[in-house]
């Protein structure tokens, strides 16, 4: 049964609101689900419940809790889309990494689940990459992560498996940025990159106008196989 919980932030900063979905039996592992700039909306909750159905404990933290708590926005509604952009402009990704670390510690110590993965979308895809470079999570997956090309210098710190889903027509990630990601990460033994020809940002959304059914199903199947291999 999904519930809303709070997770202690690092350094006593406060409490991170989070959405929690758990399987009916002991979880095989935990997955931290990092949302797009639209917050823990219905689409992210659907993804959490899907992971629970596959036997994982899923935790989706409210990444904007410091200045816009409770944001649940719809990308297909223009004023809400613009609010999401405004939230992103205020956001400090370093705080996001701290929140991922806080969630991982919570899952391991309070939930008693030792293996932890991260899956993120858009801004969350960038944070999934940063989690792979800066934390000890066991595996990470990023969908259409933004600004990863600006952080390739951190790739040498990746010690656990990372998978990135890259739509080639992503209007937020230029072809030059995609080329840089491939040049920087293709040689890395822990990194797997998948391109999706002609697809755009948000293609794996749970619903809405951005979703591409075939591409979403393919990417999600690859993610499930990846986590099954590296988390159990």
What function would you assign to each model-found segment?
Residues 1-232:
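N-terminal cap/leader regions of alpha/beta-hydrolase-fold enzymes
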